[in-house]
Amino acid sequence: EQFMGLMEKQSFDSDRKEVLDHALLTSWFTTDQCIRLMDFYRFDSEKKQLMKKIYPKIADKPNFYYAIDKLTFSSDKNEINAFIKQYHEKNN
């Protein structure tokens, strides 16, 4: 929760990106936390960037479809699903 508070304090996307990048070095995230982070972004293009960046550090990957469902367009959902498939093909 401290992390979310820190993210909320950041005025600029670039500052939020820096905080997130630092956290990704040492921390794992849940799908629920990813969904909450997605709320910081207005556009699906930004949300997709976040999802691709955070997915390797998601602790409950089987639940990630809940995050995917938050995207507006099926083409964006398909893109993230393809990314996840490719991720698992490369890392298994």
List each model region and its residues.
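General marker for long, soluble alpha-helical cores
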Residues: E1-N92
